[in-house]
């Protein structure tokens, strides 16, 4: 993740001094070779481990990616890496929209450089966007490890399976939870403590693959400590959810969901 961040945000992280006379193609090429080697090794280990997990394979045949033979495991790992690196330009493009959203949405941001260097929300989004590509390729274990690493460092828990659009904004971020099957549109803003979660997980593994988390349409703002729960819950485009609201049913576009005003005595 550290090396990938150096590639996706060249000149911001690492010891290299990128100048007009520096060859960015050489720097990025050498770094990508190292990343590919390390990532492929980790994918091989994850696939080998999962192929031996017969109970998991029976519960979800999609988790058996390669039949378990070393040759097929290595071939599958190489295929995953090819797709992953093909996706890096798109990941970078989307991350730059996230930087723009954070800068535009936070008056305290002094510059985009400040956002890139120091905002925990951007770091959590970055890790999610990388992990999501591996998740889409049915790579076991690694996407979860990545997002939990970001969770432990930022307090922001984004499931690798969530689908999140461009210009995504998380302010402060502590306590934000975004479930695995959440769908989020473009230009969405979340504040600290927001939960986009499931109504109940009593079904356990029977609910694997079932949409359990809400859909948040474009240009929605959800303020601090609000909870939006349930796989059938849709928050319509342009809506605003007030802080500490508890929403378990769909909301039409351009709605305002607020709590009853507190009494002052």
Can you say where each PLM-predicted feature lies in the sequence?
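Alpha-helical transmembrane segments of helical membrane proteins, especially in multi-pass transport
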Residues: 177, 181-183, 187-189
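Glycine-rich hexapeptide-repeat left-handed beta-helix
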Residues: 186-265
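Glycine-rich beta-solenoid repeat tracts in large extracellular/virion proteins
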Residues: 156, 176, 227-228
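Glycine-rich phosphate-binding loop
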Residues: 170-178
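Terminal amphipathic alpha-helical/low-complexity segments used for targeting or macromolecular assembly
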Residues: 1-148
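Short, conserved active-site entrance elements at the starts or edges of catalytic domains
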Residues: 136-166
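Short coil/loop residues immediately preceding or within conserved phosphate-binding loops
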Residues: 153, 173, 211
């Amino acid at each position: 993740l550290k090396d990938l961040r150096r590639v996706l945000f060249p000149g911001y992280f690492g010891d290299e001094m990128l100048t007009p006379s520096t060859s960015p193609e050489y720097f990025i090429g050498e770094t990508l070779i190292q990343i590919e080697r390390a990532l492929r090794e980790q994918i091989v280990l994850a696939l080998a481990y999962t192929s031996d997990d017969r109970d998991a394979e029976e519960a979800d045949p999609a988790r058996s990616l390669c039949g378990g033979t070393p040759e097929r495991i290595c071939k599958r790992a190489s295929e995953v890496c090819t797709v992953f690196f093909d996706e890096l330009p798109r990941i970078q493009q989307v991350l730059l929209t996230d930087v723009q959203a954070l800068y535009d949405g936070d008056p305290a941001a002094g510059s985009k450089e400040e956002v890139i260097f120091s905002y925990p929300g951007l770091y959590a989004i970055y890790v999610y966007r990388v992990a999501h590509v591996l998740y889409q390729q049915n790579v076991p274990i690694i996407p979860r490890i990545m997002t939990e690493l970001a969770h432990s460092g930022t307090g922001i828990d984004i499931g690798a399976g969530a689908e999140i659009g461009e210009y995504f904004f998380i302010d402060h971020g502590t306590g934000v939870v975004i479930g695995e099957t959440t769908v989020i549109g473009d230009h969405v803003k979340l504040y600290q403590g927001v939960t986009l979660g499931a109504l109940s997980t009593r079904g356990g593994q029977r609910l694997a693959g079932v949409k359990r988390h809400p859909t948040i349409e474009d240009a929605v703002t959800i303020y601090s400590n609000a909870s939006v729960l349930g796989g059938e819950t849709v928050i319509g485009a342009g809506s605003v959810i007030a802080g500490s609201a508890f929403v378990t049913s769909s909301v039409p576009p351009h709605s305002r969901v607020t709590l009853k005003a507190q009494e002052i005595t």
